[in-house]
Amino acid sequence: MDLAQSESMMTSVLADALNTFEGARMSELLEFYASEAMTCPRRVYFRLKGYKERWPDFVRVRLEQGVNTHNVLGKVLKRRFGFELEKHIVLKSPRLGLEIHGRIDAFRRFPIEIKGKTSLPRSPYDYHLAQLNVYLRWAESEYGYLYYVKLHEEPKKVLRDIDFSRFPIVRGKGFKAFEVPYDEKLFKETVKQFYLIKKHYEKGIPPEGWNCYTCKFCPYYYICFGNDFTL
């Protein structure tokens, strides 16, 4: 079988399997996370293989601030608008041998994903769109929302100036909200990437990494760029 035939067969298998996601629990399925959607394949591979995470100190500080931001904004969404927080979801495809787990930051008919950033983007990051898109698929919602909040040592100071009068479109200094429609093509691309990572996992061969500026934020930076580790 030549390369073209092989790719055609894989595409066919993926197309047939995309509609098989279901709720049945099957322990043999390889577990991916929605937050890994369309991120560096090598990073996902290392996580699946059980390599130890080593977060850079400056990233740890941002992670802590991000958690605090999630908690403060989450309480507002729950108290004022009745949203469920940290909603656990699972999409399963027995045919592909994989499942996608996730925790929606806030959910009530549609998902809201909260991202704390040191600077606010002009448009959503691709991998954030892919993560939210997984949640939209699970919820069967037409639209969801990405909330970007500027990181601060005291997130309440940022959130107290936010205008919720046009919720779920929210405005304020240090805050950006994006309404995002469900994208079937993006979901297929996400599943395809997870499936390809699964094949690398089964062969024990790491996939190519991104090798870009985001690498310095990765907990597996020490593997790809350290002097004390050889693949």
Give the positions of each predicted feature.
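Short, well-structured alpha-helical patches and their helix-loop capping segments
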Residues: 98, 123-127, 182, 186
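A short beta-strand motif that forms part of the nucleic acid-binding face
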Residues: 115-118, 150-151
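Metal-dependent nuclease catalytic cores in nucleic-acid-processing enzymes
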Residues: 71-79, 123-152
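Metal-dependent nuclease catalytic regions and adjoining charged, substrate-binding loops involved
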Residues: 2-5, 141-231
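A structural signal for short, well-ordered beta-strand segments and their strand-loop junctions
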Residues: 84, 107, 111-113, 143-148, ...
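Metal-dependent nuclease catalytic cores that hydrolyze phosphodiester bonds in DNA/RNA
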Residues: 1-111, 118-120, 124
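A residue-level signal for conserved active-site and pocket-lining positions in enzyme catalytic cores
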Residues: 40, 135, 218
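Residue-level detector of short, conserved catalytic/binding motifs and their immediate flanks
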Residues: 104, 133, 216
